[in-house]
Amino acid sequence: MLIPHLHFCGCCGEAIALYEKAFHTKAESIVYNRDYAPDECPDDDRIAHAVMDIHGQKVFLNDRFGNKDKSLDCAVHLIVMFPSVEELLACYAFFKEESTVIDPFVKLPYSELSGNFMDQFGVQWGFMTE
């Protein structure tokens, strides 16, 4: 099994809240640093480990090694396949205002609608229809 692991810089909780709304899902589990290492980090609200299901794919998330610079120069982004243009656009509406477009949404020979963007947390996404 291959599991994408998304890293954030202290904003993992915000990302989880957005992804829960956009993808109509809930985090399966969240472990905070204060729970993971209570003696060392009793008041640390950063997330040590979280698990979500996004479109049928298990995804891990945490507050380590995040993309501080939010650079577009990245070799990896997550592709989400939608059954319809309407569902794609409804999900993208949650990201649109604070995202950076990498490739605008257009019709391609293999997809009715496809586009790439970086969300406000520095995660790069590709949304396309099946």
Where are these regions (language model features)?
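Glycine-centered flexibility motif
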Residues: 10, 73-75, 115
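Short, solvent-exposed beta-strand edge segments and adjacent coil->beta transition regions
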Residues: 1-3, 73-77
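Short glycine/proline-enriched turns and hinge-like loops at secondary-structure junctions
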Residues: 43, 71-74
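Vicinal oxygen chelate
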Residues: 28-29, 48-53, 63-70, 80-130
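Core segments of cupin and vicinal oxygen chelate
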Residues: 6-56
